[in-house]
């Protein structure tokens, strides 16, 4: 692993390994040995991890992963870290170990006292943000609210501007097939999404920015990948994650919007079945670290 002397010019990037029985330790090690990380950061592995059998998660490995998250968020809130990158965890094991959150996104938001947050994923030419996240598909329609679409859309605009998109172009995906076909295939577009898009358009101060939608979900991601849009605002979890992973499976990054510090993670799981076999790829972890460094450099402190 590379070690850098801490100084004022280096951004301090805390990295958790996730569940140490998975590929987390392996991909972090590969990433820190890679020439694809900038030298403008100090990379700090956070947490204490037990000896374990690779591929065999236990409650002990889950508790260690949870404790590492607690340490990382505490140090970031104390301004001891400029950004946090989290390794993959096994949610079922985490729940058994007492973890009370749907995912790491919700954990960081609660620990930071943040209500206005969102899940965003980026990879290749596609960036998506999710209006609803970890809920059953049959609850999505009831959970969609105009103010939530506007709230997440504004966070997405801020994120894109932070990444130097001065005039972001955002597509808003419809919920139903063909964006509802003028109400024939569902009323959510007419009653919820269209008013939210209009409100977003009026809230964006830069007239060169574009908020367009609701657009048919079956073509909007192709249009984004072709460069027509900088991001897609999605109504539910798999609407955004399926095209992103199809387009950029090995480079996808999860980033939590709205936190007081950058938090990213690779967009994949623990992969217990290949842990320790020397076949795990670190591309997504490398991308997550690079994005954390980029955002840390642009971070505005209160």
Residue ranges and their predicted role:
Residues 116, 124-127, 249, 268:
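A generic structural signal for well-ordered coil/turn residues at beta-strand boundaries
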Residues 118-120, 234:
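Short, hydrophobic/aromatic-rich beta-strand segments within well-structured domains
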Residues 105-115:
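A glycine-rich helix N-cap at a beta->alpha junction
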Residues 121-151:
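Ligand-binding beta-strand-loop-alpha-helix segment within the catalytic cores
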């Amino acid at each position: 692993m590379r070690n850098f002397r801490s100084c004022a010019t280096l951004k301090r990037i805390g990295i958790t390994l996730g569940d140490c029985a998975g590929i987390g330790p392996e991909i972090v090690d590969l990433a820190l040995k890679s020439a694809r990380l900038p030298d403008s950061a100090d990379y700090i592995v956070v947490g204490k991890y037990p000896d374990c059998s690779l591929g065999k998660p236990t409650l002990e490995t889950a508790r260690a992963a949870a404790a590492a998250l607690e340490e990382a968020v505490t140090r970031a809130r104390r301004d001891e870290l400029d950004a946090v990158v989290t390794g993959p965890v096994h949610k079922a094991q985490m729940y058994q170990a007492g973890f009370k959150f749907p995912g790491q996104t919700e954990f960081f938001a609660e620990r930071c006292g943040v209500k206005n947050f969102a899940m965003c994923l980026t990879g290749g030419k596609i960036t998506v943000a999710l209006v609803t996240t970890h809920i059953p598909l049959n609850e999505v329609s009831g959970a969609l609210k105009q103010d939530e679409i506007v709230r997440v859309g504004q966070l997405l605009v801020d994120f894109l501007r932070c990444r130097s998109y001065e005039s972001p172009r955002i597509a808003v995906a419809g919920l139903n097939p063909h964006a509802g076909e003028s109400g024939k295939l569902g009323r959510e577009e007419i009653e919820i999404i269209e008013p939210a898009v209009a409100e977003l358009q009026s809230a964006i101060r830069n007239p060169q920015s574009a908020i367009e939608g609701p657009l048919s979900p079956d073509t909007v991601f192709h249009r984004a990948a072709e460069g027509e849009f900088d991001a897609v605002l999605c109504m539910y979890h798999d609407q955004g994650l399926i095209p992103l992973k199809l387009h950029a499976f090995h480079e996808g990054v999860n980033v939590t919007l709205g936190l007081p510090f950058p938090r990213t993670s690779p967009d994949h799981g623990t992969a217990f079945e290949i842990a320790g076999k020397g076949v795990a790829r670190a591309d997504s972890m490398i991308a997550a670290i690079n994005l954390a460094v980029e955002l840390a450099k642009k971070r505005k402190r209160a």
